[in-house]
Design a protein with these regions (language model features):
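Long, highly charged, low-complexity intrinsically disordered interaction regions
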Residues: 1-106
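Charged catalytic cores and adjacent phosphate/nucleic-acid-binding surfaces used
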Residues: 2, 33, 42, 54, ...
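Short, compositionally biased low-complexity segments
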Residues: 3-6, 138-145
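Ser/Thr-glycine-rich phosphate-binding loops at phosphate-binding pockets of nucleotides
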Residues: 115-121, 142-146
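Short strand->helix junction
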Residues: 120-122, 305-306
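Positively charged, glycine-rich low-complexity segments
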Residues: 125
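Core AdoMet radical
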Residues: 144-145, 186-188
Protein backbone atom coordinates (compact mmCIF):
# COMPACT_ATOMS: atom_id res chain seq x y z
CA UNK A 1 0.00 0.00 0.00
CA UNK A 2 1.42 3.38 -0.99
CA UNK A 3 1.85 6.38 1.26
CA UNK A 4 -0.84 8.21 -0.71
CA UNK A 5 -3.32 5.38 -0.12
CA UNK A 6 -2.60 5.28 3.62
CA UNK A 7 -2.91 9.06 3.84
CA UNK A 8 -6.21 8.98 1.95
CA UNK A 9 -7.59 6.39 4.38
CA UNK A 10 -6.70 8.55 7.39
CA UNK A 11 -8.05 11.66 5.67
CA UNK A 12 -11.33 9.86 5.04
CA UNK A 13 -11.50 8.73 8.65
CA UNK A 14 -11.01 12.30 9.82
CA UNK A 15 -13.84 13.48 7.57
CA UNK A 16 -16.12 10.69 8.78
CA UNK A 17 -15.43 11.62 12.39
CA UNK A 18 -16.11 15.27 11.57
CA UNK A 19 -19.47 14.48 10.03
CA UNK A 20 -20.29 12.37 13.06
CA UNK A 21 -19.68 15.38 15.29
CA UNK A 22 -16.37 14.30 16.83
CA UNK A 23 -14.15 16.71 18.72
CA UNK A 24 -12.27 18.92 16.25
CA UNK A 25 -8.91 18.00 17.83
CA UNK A 26 -9.54 14.36 17.02
CA UNK A 27 -10.41 15.26 13.45
CA UNK A 28 -7.32 17.44 13.18
CA UNK A 29 -5.09 14.62 14.47
CA UNK A 30 -6.10 12.36 11.58
CA UNK A 31 -5.64 15.09 9.01
CA UNK A 32 -2.25 16.05 10.43
CA UNK A 33 -1.16 12.42 10.32
CA UNK A 34 -2.40 12.10 6.74
CA UNK A 35 -0.27 15.07 5.69
CA UNK A 36 2.78 13.70 7.48
CA UNK A 37 2.39 10.33 5.76
CA UNK A 38 1.85 11.93 2.38
CA UNK A 39 5.05 13.94 2.84
CA UNK A 40 7.10 11.07 4.27
CA UNK A 41 10.08 10.29 1.99
CA UNK A 42 10.15 6.64 3.10
CA UNK A 43 7.64 3.86 2.53
CA UNK A 44 5.26 3.94 5.50
CA UNK A 45 4.37 0.30 4.89
CA UNK A 46 8.04 -0.64 5.25
CA UNK A 47 8.41 1.53 8.36
CA UNK A 48 5.37 -0.18 9.87
CA UNK A 49 6.78 -3.62 9.12
CA UNK A 50 9.97 -2.61 10.90
CA UNK A 51 8.07 -1.23 13.90
CA UNK A 52 9.19 2.31 13.12
CA UNK A 53 5.97 4.00 12.04
CA UNK A 54 5.86 6.09 15.23
CA UNK A 55 8.98 7.85 13.99
CA UNK A 56 6.67 9.83 11.71
CA UNK A 57 5.64 13.12 13.39
CA UNK A 58 2.10 12.98 14.76
CA UNK A 59 1.87 9.17 14.78
CA UNK A 60 1.28 7.71 18.24
CA UNK A 61 0.16 4.31 19.45
CA UNK A 62 -3.49 4.68 18.41
CA UNK A 63 -2.66 5.77 14.89
CA UNK A 64 0.04 3.11 14.63
CA UNK A 65 -2.56 0.44 15.43
CA UNK A 66 -4.95 1.80 12.82
CA UNK A 67 -2.22 1.91 10.18
CA UNK A 68 -1.14 -1.66 10.95
CA UNK A 69 -4.75 -2.85 10.70
CA UNK A 70 -5.17 -0.96 7.43
CA UNK A 71 -2.05 -2.57 5.99
CA UNK A 72 -3.15 -6.02 7.13
CA UNK A 73 -6.84 -5.91 6.19
CA UNK A 74 -7.15 -3.08 3.70
CA UNK A 75 -9.47 -1.02 5.89
CA UNK A 76 -9.89 0.56 9.33
CA UNK A 77 -12.72 -0.85 11.51
CA UNK A 78 -13.78 2.55 12.83
CA UNK A 79 -14.07 3.83 9.25
CA UNK A 80 -16.20 0.83 8.31
CA UNK A 81 -18.48 1.53 11.28
CA UNK A 82 -18.83 5.22 10.46
CA UNK A 83 -19.47 4.54 6.77
CA UNK A 84 -22.33 2.29 7.82
CA UNK A 85 -23.71 5.04 10.01
CA UNK A 86 -23.15 8.16 7.91
CA UNK A 87 -23.47 7.38 4.25
CA UNK A 88 -26.91 6.12 4.97
CA UNK A 89 -27.52 9.82 5.59
CA UNK A 90 -25.32 10.92 2.69
CA UNK A 91 -27.00 8.54 0.26
CA UNK A 92 -30.34 9.65 1.61
CA UNK A 93 -29.62 13.15 0.36
CA UNK A 94 -29.29 12.00 -3.22
CA UNK A 95 -32.23 9.62 -3.05
CA UNK A 96 -34.44 12.24 -1.41
CA UNK A 97 -33.75 14.75 -4.15
CA UNK A 98 -34.29 12.09 -6.83
CA UNK A 99 -37.42 10.55 -5.34
CA UNK A 100 -39.05 13.80 -4.25
CA UNK A 101 -38.86 15.97 -7.34
CA UNK A 102 -41.37 18.35 -5.74
CA UNK A 103 -42.22 20.33 -8.83
CA UNK A 104 -41.08 23.91 -8.41
CA UNK A 105 -39.06 23.34 -5.22
CA UNK A 106 -35.51 24.60 -4.86
CA UNK A 107 -32.77 22.28 -6.14
CA UNK A 108 -29.03 22.17 -5.61
CA UNK A 109 -28.54 23.31 -9.19
CA UNK A 110 -30.37 26.55 -8.34
CA UNK A 111 -27.75 27.65 -5.80
CA UNK A 112 -25.47 30.42 -7.04
CA UNK A 113 -23.33 31.02 -3.96
CA UNK A 114 -22.50 30.10 -0.38
CA UNK A 115 -22.65 32.77 2.31
CA UNK A 116 -21.18 30.92 5.30
CA UNK A 117 -17.69 29.45 5.12
CA UNK A 118 -14.51 29.64 7.17
CA UNK A 119 -10.79 29.68 6.45
CA UNK A 120 -7.53 29.34 8.32
CA UNK A 121 -7.96 32.93 9.49
CA UNK A 122 -10.17 31.53 12.27
CA UNK A 123 -10.94 27.82 12.65
CA UNK A 124 -11.13 26.61 9.05
CA UNK A 125 -8.76 24.10 7.47
CA UNK A 126 -8.25 25.70 4.07
CA UNK A 127 -7.01 29.05 2.87
CA UNK A 128 -9.10 31.75 1.25
CA UNK A 129 -7.68 30.84 -2.16
CA UNK A 130 -8.45 27.13 -1.70
CA UNK A 131 -12.04 27.81 -0.62
CA UNK A 132 -12.56 30.19 -3.54
CA UNK A 133 -11.24 27.64 -6.04
CA UNK A 134 -13.50 24.92 -4.61
CA UNK A 135 -16.54 27.21 -4.80
CA UNK A 136 -15.76 28.06 -8.41
CA UNK A 137 -15.51 24.35 -9.26
CA UNK A 138 -19.06 24.01 -7.94
CA UNK A 139 -20.18 26.64 -10.41
CA UNK A 140 -20.87 29.31 -7.82
CA UNK A 141 -20.82 32.99 -8.71
CA UNK A 142 -19.99 34.20 -5.19
CA UNK A 143 -18.66 33.01 -1.85
CA UNK A 144 -18.71 34.82 1.47
CA UNK A 145 -15.86 34.27 3.92
CA UNK A 146 -17.31 35.21 7.33
CA UNK A 147 -14.60 33.92 9.63
CA UNK A 148 -15.44 33.90 13.34
CA UNK A 149 -15.16 37.10 15.32
CA UNK A 150 -13.05 37.70 18.40
CA UNK A 151 -15.28 36.40 21.22
CA UNK A 152 -16.76 33.20 19.81
CA UNK A 153 -14.53 31.11 22.06
CA UNK A 154 -12.66 28.81 19.66
CA UNK A 155 -10.18 28.97 16.80
CA UNK A 156 -7.87 31.92 16.27
CA UNK A 157 -8.78 35.33 17.62
CA UNK A 158 -9.69 37.50 14.63
CA UNK A 159 -8.95 40.95 15.97
CA UNK A 160 -10.27 44.08 14.31
CA UNK A 161 -6.80 44.68 12.88
CA UNK A 162 -6.69 41.21 11.31
CA UNK A 163 -10.18 41.66 9.89
CA UNK A 164 -9.20 44.96 8.27
CA UNK A 165 -6.33 43.07 6.65
CA UNK A 166 -8.72 40.40 5.36
CA UNK A 167 -10.98 43.08 3.83
CA UNK A 168 -8.01 44.52 1.94
CA UNK A 169 -6.91 41.03 0.86
CA UNK A 170 -10.33 40.17 -0.59
CA UNK A 171 -10.70 43.53 -2.32
CA UNK A 172 -7.36 42.99 -4.02
CA UNK A 173 -8.35 39.42 -4.93
CA UNK A 174 -11.58 40.61 -6.56
CA UNK A 175 -9.78 43.21 -8.66
CA UNK A 176 -8.11 40.48 -10.70
CA UNK A 177 -11.18 38.24 -11.15
CA UNK A 178 -14.24 38.34 -13.37
CA UNK A 179 -17.36 36.21 -13.10
CA UNK A 180 -16.79 35.26 -9.47
CA UNK A 181 -16.86 37.38 -6.34
CA UNK A 182 -15.53 36.88 -2.84
CA UNK A 183 -17.34 38.68 -0.04
CA UNK A 184 -15.35 39.95 2.92
CA UNK A 185 -17.42 39.05 5.93
CA UNK A 186 -17.56 38.05 9.54
CA UNK A 187 -19.61 35.61 11.57
CA UNK A 188 -19.99 37.94 14.52
CA UNK A 189 -20.81 36.58 17.94
CA UNK A 190 -23.91 38.12 19.52
CA UNK A 191 -23.29 39.20 23.10
CA UNK A 192 -25.90 38.58 25.77
CA UNK A 193 -27.08 42.18 25.36
CA UNK A 194 -27.22 41.91 21.57
CA UNK A 195 -23.95 43.75 21.05
CA UNK A 196 -21.48 42.68 18.38
CA UNK A 197 -17.73 42.16 18.58
CA UNK A 198 -16.55 44.85 16.19
CA UNK A 199 -17.01 48.64 16.03
CA UNK A 200 -19.66 49.99 13.69
CA UNK A 201 -17.17 51.51 11.26
CA UNK A 202 -15.57 48.10 10.69
CA UNK A 203 -18.92 46.32 10.31
CA UNK A 204 -19.91 48.95 7.73
CA UNK A 205 -16.88 48.09 5.59
CA UNK A 206 -17.72 44.38 5.38
CA UNK A 207 -19.57 42.97 2.38
CA UNK A 208 -21.51 40.49 4.52
CA UNK A 209 -22.24 40.12 8.23
CA UNK A 210 -23.83 37.00 9.68
CA UNK A 211 -24.54 37.23 13.40
CA UNK A 212 -24.79 34.09 15.54
CA UNK A 213 -25.02 33.03 19.17
CA UNK A 214 -21.97 31.02 20.27
CA UNK A 215 -21.94 31.68 24.02
CA UNK A 216 -24.27 31.88 27.06
CA UNK A 217 -26.89 29.42 25.82
CA UNK A 218 -28.70 29.05 29.15
CA UNK A 219 -30.17 32.54 29.56
CA UNK A 220 -33.95 32.91 29.67
CA UNK A 221 -36.11 32.82 26.55
CA UNK A 222 -36.96 36.49 27.02
CA UNK A 223 -33.30 37.51 27.22
CA UNK A 224 -32.25 35.26 24.33
CA UNK A 225 -35.02 36.62 22.13
CA UNK A 226 -34.13 40.22 23.00
CA UNK A 227 -30.46 39.42 22.37
CA UNK A 228 -31.10 38.14 18.84
CA UNK A 229 -33.68 40.80 17.96
CA UNK A 230 -31.23 43.52 18.99
CA UNK A 231 -28.66 42.05 16.59
CA UNK A 232 -31.28 41.82 13.85
CA UNK A 233 -32.01 45.52 14.24
CA UNK A 234 -28.35 46.42 13.73
CA UNK A 235 -28.15 48.05 10.28
CA UNK A 236 -24.99 46.10 9.44
CA UNK A 237 -26.30 42.58 10.19
CA UNK A 238 -27.43 40.88 6.98
CA UNK A 239 -28.29 37.43 8.31
CA UNK A 240 -28.75 35.43 11.51
CA UNK A 241 -26.87 32.13 11.61
CA UNK A 242 -28.10 28.79 13.05
CA UNK A 243 -30.96 30.49 14.86
CA UNK A 244 -31.75 27.97 17.60
CA UNK A 245 -28.19 26.77 18.31
CA UNK A 246 -29.08 23.10 18.27
CA UNK A 247 -26.54 20.33 17.73
CA UNK A 248 -28.56 17.25 16.88
CA UNK A 249 -28.07 14.51 19.44
CA UNK A 250 -25.66 16.65 21.46
CA UNK A 251 -27.31 19.94 22.43
CA UNK A 252 -30.95 20.94 22.58
CA UNK A 253 -32.02 24.25 21.01
CA UNK A 254 -31.75 27.13 23.42
CA UNK A 255 -34.96 28.86 24.50
CA UNK A 256 -35.92 31.53 21.96
CA UNK A 257 -39.21 32.90 20.62
CA UNK A 258 -38.75 32.04 16.96
CA UNK A 259 -41.94 33.81 15.89
CA UNK A 260 -40.75 37.05 17.47
CA UNK A 261 -37.36 36.70 15.78
CA UNK A 262 -39.01 36.06 12.41
CA UNK A 263 -41.22 39.12 12.84
CA UNK A 264 -38.19 41.29 13.63
CA UNK A 265 -36.24 39.89 10.68
CA UNK A 266 -39.13 40.58 8.32
CA UNK A 267 -39.42 44.13 9.65
CA UNK A 268 -35.70 44.91 9.31
CA UNK A 269 -34.91 43.08 6.06
CA UNK A 270 -32.58 40.59 7.77
CA UNK A 271 -32.12 37.17 6.20
CA UNK A 272 -32.18 33.86 8.06
CA UNK A 273 -30.06 30.86 7.14
CA UNK A 274 -30.66 27.16 6.87
CA UNK A 275 -27.31 25.97 8.18
CA UNK A 276 -26.34 22.82 6.28
CA UNK A 277 -23.96 21.43 8.88
CA UNK A 278 -25.50 17.96 9.28
CA UNK A 279 -25.31 18.32 13.06
CA UNK A 280 -27.26 21.59 12.93
CA UNK A 281 -29.75 21.73 10.02
CA UNK A 282 -30.98 24.93 11.60
CA UNK A 283 -33.42 26.47 10.64
CA UNK A 284 -35.50 23.31 10.79
CA UNK A 285 -38.32 22.82 8.27
CA UNK A 286 -41.05 24.39 10.41
CA UNK A 287 -38.99 27.52 11.04
CA UNK A 288 -37.86 27.79 7.41
CA UNK A 289 -41.49 27.71 6.31
CA UNK A 290 -42.36 30.36 8.89
CA UNK A 291 -39.59 32.61 7.59
CA UNK A 292 -40.59 32.19 3.95
CA UNK A 293 -44.24 32.89 4.75
CA UNK A 294 -43.13 36.13 6.40
CA UNK A 295 -41.38 37.16 3.19
CA UNK A 296 -37.87 36.69 4.57
CA UNK A 297 -35.27 35.57 2.01
CA UNK A 298 -33.86 32.32 3.37
CA UNK A 299 -30.18 31.58 2.72
CA UNK A 300 -28.97 28.00 2.20
CA UNK A 301 -25.49 27.80 3.72
CA UNK A 302 -22.89 25.14 4.43
CA UNK A 303 -20.99 26.53 7.44
CA UNK A 304 -18.04 24.90 5.68
CA UNK A 305 -14.79 24.72 7.63
CA UNK A 306 -12.97 23.04 4.75
CA UNK A 307 -13.42 22.43 1.05
CA UNK A 308 -15.00 19.00 1.61
CA UNK A 309 -17.78 20.43 3.79
CA UNK A 310 -18.93 22.72 1.00
CA UNK A 311 -20.94 19.57 0.23
CA UNK A 312 -23.12 20.43 3.24
CA UNK A 313 -25.27 22.41 0.81
CA UNK A 314 -27.11 19.13 0.16
CA UNK A 315 -28.29 19.02 3.77
CA UNK A 316 -29.53 22.61 3.57
CA UNK A 317 -31.39 21.76 0.36
CA UNK A 318 -33.09 18.79 2.03
CA UNK A 319 -34.45 21.05 4.76
CA UNK A 320 -35.50 23.72 2.26
CA UNK A 321 -37.36 21.23 0.10
CA UNK A 322 -38.99 19.69 3.16
CA UNK A 323 -40.20 23.19 4.03
CA UNK A 324 -41.62 23.58 0.54
CA UNK A 325 -39.28 26.41 -0.44
CA UNK A 326 -39.08 27.46 -4.08
CA UNK A 327 -36.09 29.15 -5.73
CA UNK A 328 -37.83 32.50 -5.18
CA UNK A 329 -37.88 31.85 -1.42
CA UNK A 330 -34.12 31.26 -1.32
CA UNK A 331 -31.83 34.28 -1.43
CA UNK A 332 -28.76 32.61 -2.89
CA UNK A 333 -30.48 31.27 -5.98
CA UNK A 334 -30.05 34.82 -7.29
CA UNK A 335 -27.26 36.17 -9.44
CA UNK A 336 -24.71 38.31 -7.64
CA UNK A 337 -26.36 41.48 -8.93
CA UNK A 338 -29.77 40.46 -7.61
CA UNK A 339 -28.44 39.00 -4.36
CA UNK A 340 -26.43 42.13 -3.59
CA UNK A 341 -29.67 44.13 -3.48
CA UNK A 342 -30.76 42.08 -0.45
CA UNK A 343 -27.69 43.11 1.55
CA UNK A 344 -28.38 45.98 3.92
CA UNK A 345 -25.46 48.18 2.80
Amino acid sequence: MTNAEIAAALEELGTLYERDGADRYRVRAYRTAARAIRDCPDSVAELAAAGRVKEIPGIGKTLEEKILTLLETGDIPSAVKLRGKLPAATAELDSFLAENPGEGLVELSDIRGDLHSHTTLSDGRNTLEEMAAAAQKRGYAYLAIPDHSASHGFGDNVTAERLWGRIEEIRAWNEDRRGFRLLAGSEVNIGTDGSLDYPEDLLAELDWVIASVHTSFSISEERMTSRIVTAIENPHVDCIGHLTGRLIGRREPYAVDVEAVVAAAAQSGTMLEINGNPNRRDLKEEHARLAADAGIPVVLNTDAHGIETLDNMSYAAIVARGAGLTPDDVANTRSWGDFSRLIKR
